[in-house]
């Protein structure tokens, strides 16, 4: 259609130009005197007009000018002049045979010239419609193709082929989809056995965990066409477009079968039906209905598999998740420590790492990081190294990148008064000291009073191992840890500030969850309160259901207050009994501004004493010596662990070798026994003959 418009516009423009040339330049040019009527009238009366050609009220012909030269003329008879008088004069001149008069009918415009305005208006309308459709469809589709699918087809020859070897840290998830790949490679094996491969696989997990990447690996491993489309690409401004695009998508997929259709962010089109306050028809629901029909309508041997990804499975329509549609769900969560190490190895490729960079240590220090976070971490480390004009990425640079990813950009240039520095130091020291004194909190990784992001300072605690459950004691101690900053301000400065606002929000949230979600209240018992389900298009608070009475609501508030008050009292007790530790850490923060895990541990235990007159250049060498000793000890411990792992691996290899030899021996024995049996059978046959 676009080529047609280009060709048609060229020919139309050429036709108009040629017509203009013919109309204006096709006739020979001749000099004509333009006479007003009074001059023409005098010339007519004085016998100076020899020819007159009448066309309605205009007169053309030949006259004799003042130089006695015959020239062409043109004049116009005004309506106010009497035609009868002009007629009498002309008749008189004709009778005298001094004037030749001719007349012509009114000029008529050729039919094709009369059609030009209409044709021009039609062309303008077509061009306007074409531009309108281009804009409404994002400029990438053709006219009248708004009902076509926007899915992009990826084939083997397009770019780099991704396989399971390129996916790190998702061993269980890869195992879950291996049979899917086998079905795409060998579908007859399943069809002959009457087996049905899952028609739809739903990838569920937080953002950045690798759902899309894993799906690309499935397509690359199977070597089949891969259609990708976003859930928001179905519904647009025209009614019926969504359902039409779903039909077109499946028609394209059937032509390319076996293939994979990947719908990213399917919650955009697969939300629960009937949600919202309006009672009118929803275009999104029509699209969802068509998707449901298409998914449950194709045959078992067509080789079309739907893979979708979402981080909101709770809002998907139940009909979408039933067997026969998305009947298998693959949970793609954050990787564990082993998976993080594998992902770090992948993203460390092509980056020059210094010898002190230990990926195992980095994997332990990045709990909860998704693959996207780890990729961003290594990229930030490379950027920081380039900013420092260094050739290799050092361990301290990667640790700085970890802090930047978690807490934000460091703002050393911000001017802070001494009063606020002291307030921040005691606030963060309160968090750190309480975390150190408690037994079920994560170890302190870093404490700083340098502003980062929106925080004036922060205390970072990191777990030593991956956790999947949280106990009641851990939640209570976490509340105590969060209250450490507020309590330290009150005990030392005898005042409180707004710096604890975020801490208090988290305290209230944890305490409420303990009572209403996890049944950790002794008074209310093992019950949950409130309905977690709510309408997907409306506010949670607007549609949340209170399945309890007002009396129970008051008891819930009392239990929440009880948890918080008990934690506050414990925090006051801990800091009061360890006030000397609080002052030591706060003074160290005022001098050093940032304490890492080693420095905090050494100062807290008194291994390094910081005097009032000590300067940064006096303290830093002491810290460096102790840190070097600890790193050497960690390296020796890791070497010992690696040695033990190597021994275990050797044992496994020897066992496998022994099993293989035994299998070979058993197989040879069976073959020998079979040969003996064959010899006996042959001997018996000869005897019978």
UniProtKB/Swiss-Prot annotation:
GO (cellular component) term, any one: plasma membrane
UniProt region (Disordered), positions on chain: 661-689
UniProtKB keywords: ATP-binding, Cell membrane, Hydrolase, Membrane, Metal-binding, Metalloprotease, Nucleotide-binding, Protease, Transmembrane, Transmembrane helix, Zinc
Record EC number: 3.4.24.-
Residue intervals annotated with topology Extracellular: 25-111
Organism: Alkaliphilus metalliredigens (strain QYMF)
Localization, UniProt: Cell membrane
Topology Cytoplasmic: residue spans: 1-3, 133-689
Keyword Ribosomal protein annotated: no
Protein name (record): ATP-dependent zinc metalloprotease FtsH 2
Protein's membrane topology: Multi-pass membrane protein
Oligomer and partners: Homohexamer.
Residues the record lists as binding Zn(2+): 427, 431, 503
Family annotation (PROSITE patterns): AAA (PS00674)
Signal peptide limits: none
Predominant cellular place of this UniProt entry's protein: membrane
